[in-house]
Amino acid sequence: MLNVSVTTSSGAIEGLGKFLQYGNGRGVPSYAAFTREHTHRVHDPKYVDWDTVVSLGNTDAFVKALMLFYTSGDTLLVDEWTYPAIIGTVVPMNIQLAPVRMDAEGMVPEALDHVCTNWTGERKLRMVYTIPTAQNPTGATMSIARKRAIYAVAQKHNLVIIEDDPYYYLQFEPYTADSENRYTNLPGITSLVPSLLSLDTDGRVIRLDSFSKVLAPGLRCGWVTAPKYITDKIQFHNETSIQQPAGVSQAIVASLMNEQWGHSGWERHLVQIQRDYAMRRDLFVDLCLKHLNGLVEFTVPDAGMFLWFRVLLKPELQGQTGVMQRVFDSMVANHVLL
């Protein structure tokens, strides 16, 4: 049972009454303190004036970060295949999208540089949005070398990077057909691929984190890490909109992280989550290799929950109209979720 009725002290959280009151836009102190300490432990930002601020999850955080820099008519750089909710968010704001080519590791740095170098729009490109780990929908994960290259292009063209990383802790080992040697080297926290935030020396990365994929999406609890002048503005935006995540949700997270688990217990929980998702990945890939061989191509993901199929059409079907509609109709008839 969670204890949310203690008074504030070292390693403890506020009393329940504190969580049930209105609060400021930075979050209840024990919740906010954990997210900041956790960010320092995992990402160790390389510049001094960084901070964290609460969010209702990464979509909420994305909107607030975007509104700090963008107005109607601006253009946002995104992955060639990007998170559908982002499209639904920016279109009503009359913000255009400039897609950047992807490969098996996500956004291609040379393609990003090409788009920026040859940009002819009236307004300057200022921001690039990417999901570097287990990208939604393709499942692509950037290596550390790819992240360094993307960051270098951002420096060259003076771009702000929105690092939307809800699947960051869902990294696991490469797939092996040898079921006896699976799940022996899960990364936990210490062996994760370093984040873009951890590479940032200029204060140009706005990192979005969430508990949605590792605790529960209904908690609506997340946080933003960025230079303090940005987190301060997001705090002010919170105070005129959401105020902060629901007090009960913050109480649950704060109690787990500060009293029940601590950082070591949190890492043990993440290892178990990584194991669970690795098992699901392996079972799904095993079945795909068994039943879909020759019908589709795919890259086996090393993180997250997405596997991106490329349907292999027979030569005589290529170029015909209506083929994908027939594929879709066949999936519906066979009760396959697309």
Where are these regions (language model features)?
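Conserved core of the PLP fold type I
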Residues: V4-N158, I162, Y168-L199, Y277, ...
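A structural signal for well-ordered alpha-helical segments within the folded catalytic domains
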Residues: P29-A33, R148, K228, G247-A251, ...
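Alpha-helical scaffold elements within enzyme catalytic domains, especially in hydrolases
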Residues: T89, A152-V153, K233, D276, ...
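Short beta-strand segments
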Residues: P99, Y129-P132, I162-D165, D209, ...
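Residue-level recognition of strand-loop junctions within catalytic nucleotide-signaling folds
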Residues: Q171, P227-K228, N258, R310-L312
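Conserved core segment of the aminotransferase class I/II
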Residues: P194-R275
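Conserved glycine-rich beta-strand-loop-beta hairpin in the small C-terminal domain of fold type I
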Residues: L270-Q274, A278-V285, V296-K314
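Conserved PLP cofactor-binding pocket of PLP-dependent enzymes
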Residues: F328-L338
